[in-house]
């Protein structure tokens, strides 16, 4: 088992990575003598939930569970209210613990329910998808969606621990593994060309979930993400670089009504568009773009446009981005492979030209 510590100004917690590490020795200190609510993903095998419940039940003061059908549609005020109702009706105190066990959607909504119950209670994350292990579970971003935008209602609220058990990945469909790889490729592109090169060399082993390769990749991605979180916990500055491809990607998800693309696919399309923008403003070469697209293809990430997208509609969706300042859109672009920056005030006509030629 590998352990990465995220040491912040007001809090420090460990992120554990390994196979079959959901055991009492790793969990008991969090649940002992606590009122515990487990928010779990309906996609998880029922026997694993039963085993986990039985394992911790003797250590807890009170134990409740709620199952969430993890769709973007259900990442909503309605689901949040259901979670809050269980906490209120069972008289959970401010000393309680919420456990989020599932993919990114469950991690986000479990975290936000903890952030907003009695002005903030503790939560533990057990991410069960590759995307959640390398991205959603790390850094304290919690949120639900609004009909007009993804993650528009949320809070920064750090977990007290993260347990990334790679054994959960063995039962995932290949599409879910590819979804996680999208964020991992992003980490290399914005921060570490050597990691990007390593992904190029090891992509087949990662897709096969070979233990050494997958754990090394998860660990490296988490190291990169924790670097940005340590430096800029509330995303006032360099943490925004983690949004490479996301301004385009979130708008694509919204236009597809959260049905046409999963998050990793939308981000991959967004990265391709951001690469084209980076090329057009003179930062990277055509060969760089082709190299990244080749890795995205080898990672088996589907970047086909499912239904026609109107560039003007996509641009309108991008203007709803949380990171814009007034009417000025901030976009993350690459200065070179492995190095990113935020670019402000890019001409609307250039963005629309890229969208028209690429979609």
Please report, for each region that a protein language model flagged, where it lies by residue:
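C-terminal charged capping/lid subdomain of soluble metabolic enzymes
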Residues: 2, 12, 283-359
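Active-site segments that bind and position negatively charged phosphate/pyrophosphate groups
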Residues: 202-312
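Structural motif
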Residues: 66, 100-101, 126
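ATP/NTP phosphate-donor binding region
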Residues: 1-96
């Amino acid at each position: 088992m590998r352990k990465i510590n995220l040491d912040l100004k007001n809090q420090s917690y460990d992120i554990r990575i390994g196979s079959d590490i959901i055991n009492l020795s790793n969990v008991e200190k969090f649940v002992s003598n606590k009122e515990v609510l487990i928010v779990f993903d309906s996609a998880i095998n029922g026997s694993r939930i039963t085993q986990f419940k039985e394992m911790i039940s003797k250590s807890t003061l009170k134990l409740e569970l709620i199952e969430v059908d993890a769709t973007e549609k259900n990442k909503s005020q309605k689901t949040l209210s259901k979670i809050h109702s269980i906490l209120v009706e069972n008289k959970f105190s401010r000393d309680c613990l919420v456990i989020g066990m599932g993919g990114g959607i469950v991690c986000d909504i479990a975290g936000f329910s903890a952030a907003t119950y009695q002005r903030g209670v503790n939560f533990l994350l057990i991410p069960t998808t590759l995307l959640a292990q390398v991205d959603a579970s790390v850094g304290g971003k919690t949120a639900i969606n609004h009909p007009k935008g993804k993650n528009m209602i949320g809070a920064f609220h750090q977990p007290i621990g993260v347990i990334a058990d790679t054994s959960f990945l063995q039962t995932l469909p290949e599409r879910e593994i590819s979804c996680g790889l999208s964020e991992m490729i992003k980490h290399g592109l914005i921060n570490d060309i050597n990691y990007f090169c390593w992904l190029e060399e090891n992509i087949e082993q990662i897709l096969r979930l070979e233990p050494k390769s997958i754990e090394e990749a998860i660990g490296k991605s988490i190291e990169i993400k924790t670097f940005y979180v340590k430096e800029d916990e509330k995303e006032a500055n360099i943490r925004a670089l983690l949004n490479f491809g996301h301004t385009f990607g979130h708008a694509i998800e919204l236009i597809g009504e959260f049905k046409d693309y999963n998050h990793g696919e939308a981000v991959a399309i967004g990265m391709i568009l951001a690469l084209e923008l980076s090329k057009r403003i003179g930062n990277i070469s055509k060969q760089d773009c082709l190299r990244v697209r080749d890795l995205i293809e080898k990672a088996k990430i589907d970047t086909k446009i499912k239904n026609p997208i109107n560039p003007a509609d996509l641009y309108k969706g991008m203007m709803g981005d949380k990171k814009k300042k007034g009417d000025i859109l901030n976009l993350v672009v690459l200065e070179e492979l492995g190095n990113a920056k935020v670019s402000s005030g890019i001409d609307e006509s250039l963005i629309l030209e890229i969208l028209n030629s690429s979609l």
